Amino acid sequence: MEVLAMILAGGRGSRLDILSENRVKPSVPFAGKFRIIDFTLSNCSNSGIYDVALLTQYLPFSLNEHIGSGKPWDFDRRDSGIALLQPHEKPDGQVWYTGTADAVKQNIEYIKRKNPEYVIILSGDHIYKMNYNWMLEDHKKNNAELTIAVKTVPWEET
């Protein structure tokens, strides 16, 4: 099963206040050893998804530096790996992403060129552990057009 993971990692993260003043939210340190993005990247690697596109926009420098070649997640492969996709001027003159859906839309040519069987769109600023294969298997079993993974969380914990 050929899967392309598109990780949205370009948001400003204003609710983190000073922590994201000079870096994008997925690049914010976590537990002194990790960055928030590490959770999503580890989930991909642990699920056997090695074709990953990271869509960045706001202050991408520390995130790009942290990701590097993707070696810590085994993304430094010859025929797959990690691609850092920043917004760039298109023939229609559009440059910046205007939101998450627009970030994916502006990279549709990249998706077409990769021609994966499945595309998983993930957030780069969530902290969780998940095996994406379970979701993909359920998606295939139900012959679904779209699958969204959610978890109910009590209001007090949000």
Regions found by a protein language model. Give the residues of each.
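Unchanged
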Residues: 1-158
